[in-house]
Amino acid sequence: MAKIQAIRGTKDILPDEIQYWQFIHNKISKLLECANYQEIRTPIFENSELYDRGIGEDTDIVNKEMYRFHDRSNRDITLRPEGTAGIVRSFIENKMSYHHSLQRLWYSGPMFRYERPQSGRQRQFHQLGIEFIGSLDARADSEVIHLAMSIFNNLNLHNLKLDLNSIGKVEDRSIYQVKLRDYLTKYHDDLDTDSQKRLTSNPIRILDSKDSNTQKILTEAPKISDFLSLESQQHFGDVCNYLKLLNIPYNINNKLVRGLDYYNDTAFEIKTLTSKGQDTICGGGRYDSLVHQLGGKATPAVGCAIGLERLLLIAKDNIDLPNKSIDFYIATQGTKANETGMQIMRFLHQQFFKIEIDVSSSNFSKQIKQANKKRAVACIIIGSNEIAEGIITIKWLFSQKQENITVVQLKHSVSYLKKKILFYKSSKNY
């Protein structure tokens, strides 16, 4: 019978690797808590209309990449390809603006896109997102960018590049699209196939083309910065000024447009600079029309998302995980000893000791060997002799010293045991 394997583009995150995920998650959640951002969790599947209306029907995500299906009730369902649309749907549905006019939110979880799997890119992947809903102020844009940069700096990632652009408002882009289309039409036959299709439907998306020949053609194309309204110019200038005040260097990239239609004004990407080139690990921008577009009252917002697989690839070497060890390993032999061991396990769990009980029924020599493999600080030994004398043996594996105490004494020695474990764990040789 053929083995059942994980679907292409998905990956098991095994215990040795999950430690790094947990480390990053804990680090980021603490930082965001300090900035008074609240965690929010939304379903991983939504009505497909949410993404048709929110992301845009002319985008690659909606046209090529969504996992879309009809359920048993014939509802059109999509596994979420990104997080912002679901957050906005929740914001509207749960009337969150009635509770607080400003919402600082963050989320983390799996997303799904049918893309070609490669290093750092899977069909099921994970994003952590930051959303600031309710403010038009340029300080909101700058705060979101500052938080993203702070996350990377806290993970000892410093060789970063922040690309920044303003794509203006809908009215600005409408005028710009005409000028850009007129320019690119002259080079229609020289454009890549995708760009030829976009020339009619959404020419601004051509700026994001990865085709080298198309990029050469774009060097002389009109720049969106020349078509911004005074309001958009002022907003972008304010964002740049705040970033300077925050000592965050940036590079203005006039071709940066992002891949989602809901953005306006500020758009940005954060890339890592390595010997192998650049890799985008964070992208975001302002989306002032999305709440209204999805049926809510017009509400400004700005946010970003970080690709966790990509982040892990570059941050892993900088993460110094604490030693994997346990406090007590419980070794028993015999029915009565097993019963006593289970009772001690329960008590030590309640006192928040990290423990493991051996259930192999091996001899004590093998059980103690296993305790050493698990890097236990101490091994609690309970055999026929201990049962007969009404005691347990604690063998401190670091020093090889051991002591005999009763179960009652154990229960009154929690503070002493915690201090001793801390002493051994803090030893340089441990």
Curated annotation (Swiss-Prot):
Broadest EC class assigned to this enzyme: ligase
GO molecular function (one): ATP binding
The keyword Nucleotide-binding belongs to this UniProt entry's keyword annotation: yes
ATP-binding is among the record's keywords: yes
Record EC number: 6.1.1.21
Gene Ontology CC terms: chloroplast
A Pfam family the protein falls into: tRNA-synt_His
Major site of localization recorded for this protein: plastid
Subcellular location: Plastid, Chloroplast
SUPFAM superfamilies: Class II aaRS ABD-related, Class II aaRS and biotin synthetases
InterPro entries xrefs: aa-tRNA-synth_II (IPR006195), aa-tRNA-synth_II/BPL/LPL (IPR045864), Anticodon-bd (IPR004154), Anticodon-bd_dom_sf (IPR036621), His-tRNA-ligase (IPR015807), HisRS-like_core (IPR041715), HisRS/HisZ (IPR004516), HisRS_anticodon (IPR033656)
Keywords attached to this entry: Aminoacyl-tRNA synthetase, ATP-binding, Chloroplast, Ligase, Nucleotide-binding, Plastid, Protein biosynthesis
Gene Ontology biological-process entries: histidyl-tRNA aminoacylation
Catalytic reaction list: tRNA(His) + L-histidine + ATP = L-histidyl-tRNA(His) + AMP + diphosphate + H(+)
Family stated for the protein in its record: Belongs to the class-II aminoacyl-tRNA synthetase family.
Protein's recorded name: Histidine--tRNA ligase, chloroplastic
Lineage: Eukaryota, Rhodophyta, Bangiophyceae, Bangiales, Bangiaceae
